[in-house]
């Protein structure tokens, strides 16, 4: 703030300096970071530059970056999100990676129209996605726990869809590019889904303040 004053530039610079300190302290013992886009977007383009710089710094230190954007759309709009966060944009023949995260959280509840265009870019760039399946928030069951005619819950069905989407995008260690977000606040559902989705990486939010634990 001494350099920029009480401005968006100052706030964004403070964010990045704070993040650098965390990354410097943790990169030898923690393999990944998950910056939440909303906390950068609230500081405008200056905040988004701090997000870009944070991702670049984390990757420079050898960390895997999951960009927590929970993007949700269809077709070319979803493809644009994928290009922004995972791919490269064409600027007059020059290929430039705007943010260059390794993975992106997405909402799959628009169905295949919102996922398949992402996977083309994941294949080209060796990236991945994490799809919301059973989320950690208290009201998640209002929708996700509802039973369908198949007698499966909505979250179980979404989990199976993740396995199906990922079947043609398998890595050499037997896991697909399509991961699942499953909250630590629901340990029984977490255990159930882990057994049903053997080829799916799990992103498990909800530790600490939300009440989840190991």
Name each region found by the language model.
Residues 184-214:
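A C-terminal functional module that forms or caps the active site or interfaces directly
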